[in-house]
Amino acid sequence: MAKIEKKQAVKNNQVLSLAEKIKRKALEKQQQAHANEPSPSDEDSAQSNSKDSNSNEQPEESEEIFESFTELDLVPELIEACKNLNYNKPTPIQSKAIPPALKGSDIIGLAQTGSGKTAAFAIPILNQLWHDQQPYYACILAPTRELAQQIKETFDSLGSLMGVRSTCIVGGMSMMDQARDLMRKPHIIIATPGRLMDHLENTKGFNLRKLKYLVMDEADRLLDMEFGPVLDRILNIIPTQGRTTYLFSATMTSKIDKLQRASLTNPVKCAVSNKYQTVDTLVQTLMVVPGGLKNTFLIYLLNEFIGKSTIVFTRTKANAERISNLCNLLEFSATALHGDLNQNQRTGALDLFKAGKRSILVATDVAARGLDIPSVDIVINYDIPVDSKSYIHRVGRTARAGRSGKSISLVSQYDLELILRIEDVLGKKLPKENVDKDAILALRDSVDKANGEVVMELNRRNKEKQARGKGRRGRMATRDNMDREER
């Protein structure tokens, strides 16, 4: 027993030794980084700078571009809210979508994330709500809980001077609490499709018979996540007469075209970008990683970019949890975001990262689209995504609203075909990142030992969890299972 404890103490000392070395080097880099860094600005401040607001998409010359929100014939309370939020100049998608929306047209909005599309549909809805206030006025469908919460925050901010009441109806939260919120007759409902369907079928006194606006945000992802059947049921329940519908998507696919034909009437198409692209301010590189060295390469990179706001993307929830724990064991400041966390844990992780209390977010693709995460400096693809769309959305977390950013992809021999497809979509070869191979190899033994400790601890937790979960397998699953981000 004493030998085992002594051996464990030696392993722990080796891990701590690596952490101390990293910490000493990190302190120097962090001081230098903070001395040279400009102060970060919120992503929404892009609306106050004309150069920033036009950085991601180029408007068509035939379309009118507005210089301020006062030109859009909005109610004074909404204009004042825009000023308070530093929304001084409409972004291209807002300039294109808001005028026809104010005239009552159905809208198809095609724009990338970070383009201001949430405000593009929130502003016309709130403007009309001011003239015709009634409960259950608008319903916004979103593919993820995090995006739904973000949309709610936008409505609350823009409607702050108008007495707007909103609620967020998503899986992973109490049905009873949500039912009580719905009974308070909010004006705006933001929901994931599965949970909305639960309430339409099971919550007494709740219906959307008088709904005036329906919005499907990130519609391409709604369909990718197999929400199609639930969307069909929702569309069959809510009224078509007297309803205005907005559909926003990053791309126009055959599925999106079928959905818009079934749900929209003579829509106005407002396209800012209809192809996948990355911004010029994003530097994209790759690192060819020999077998068994991916963890070591990652720790090397995190040490090189210490003090920078970094998102590490993984393909699986297990990897996200493991890498987050590995980073923390080596005294990096990390938190995880994935679908196995409950809603409070996910919100807490995002809040820690956005507030700068954690510099590293280790996430699955749940964080790749739609989330408002300001000032991300570095994106690292620990696992290469299986499709080019996911790559574009991942690296799009950085270099937003005119800022510079960097993405680095760790490429193994099994990823070569995937990276070739990505390069084909980008229309260019990704250069290799310059690395100090000797420094990487010097970290290998210590990183492997630390990873072994993490794997043992996670296995122990999983066994405890399985023991607690015995006897529950026979229970019927609810539609909460549809409000998931990883399949």
Swiss-Prot record:
Keywords: ATP-binding, Helicase, Hydrolase, Nucleotide-binding, Nucleus, Ribosome biogenesis, RNA-binding, rRNA processing. GO terms for molecular function: ATP binding; ATP hydrolysis activity; RNA binding; RNA helicase activity. It holds the Pfam family DEAD. Belongs to the DEAD box helicase family. DDX47/RRP3 subfamily. PROSITE patterns: DEAD_ATP_HELICASE (PS00039), HELICASE_ATP_BIND_1 (PS51192), HELICASE_CTER (PS51194), Q_MOTIF (PS51195). Its EC number is 3.6.4.13. A motif (Q motif) lies at residues 67-95. This is ATP-dependent rRNA helicase RRP3. Residues 298-442 form the Helicase C-terminal domain. It catalyses: ATP + H2O = ADP + phosphate + H(+). InterPro entries: DDX47/Rrp3_DEADc, DEAD/DEAH_box_helicase_dom, DEAD_box_RNA_helicase, Helicase_ATP-bd, Helicase_C-like, P-loop_NTPase, RNA-helicase_DEAD-box_CS, RNA_helicase_DEAD_Q_motif. It comes from the Eukaryota. GO terms for biological process: rRNA processing.
